[in-house]
Design a protein with these regions (language model features):
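Amphipathic alpha-helical binding modules
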Residues: 68-107
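Amphipathic alpha-helical interaction modules
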Residues: 30-77
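Short terminal alpha-helical segments
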Residues: 1-46, 93-107
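Intrinsic-disorder/low-complexity coil detector
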Residues: 4-6, 12, 48, 72, ...
Length: 107
């Protein structure tokens, strides 16, 4: 059974838009973590915005899952950074995951 080649991001505008929205929110969250001196979360978040901007369609699910791991039951980014940033980032990540799932289902 032949595997279909991965589409380029620009060929899947809904995925690209969702990933870019999450990247913009991640930038804000990263800046906030740095301003507050939250080294743990600044280090965790540092690669996330660029990964969300640059990862291929096939890699984005793993990037979103890794970023979503910041919302753990014991150690959560919500405990260190403001809800007005952590809430929208979680929403953006979930939206990206849904768009990716829809794209994969259609293939």
């Amino acid at each position: 059974m032949a595997k279909h080649p991965e589409p380029a991001r620009h060929e899947v505008p809904a995925v690209d838009e969702a990933a870019l929205a999450a990247a913009r929110t991640a930038d804000k969250l990263l800046e906030c973590a740095r301003q507050r001196g939250s080294q743990r979360w600044a280090e965790f978040l540092a690669p996330v915005p660029d990964l969300l901007r640059d990862a291929g369609v096939g890699e984005l699910r793993a990037v979103a899952m890794r970023a979503r791991a910041a919302y753990g039951p014991r150690d959560s980014i919500r405990d260190a950074l403001p809800a007005e940033l952590t809430g929208p980032f979680l929403d953006d990540l979930d939206r990206l995951r849904k768009v990716l799932a829809r794209e994969l289902a259609e293939r």
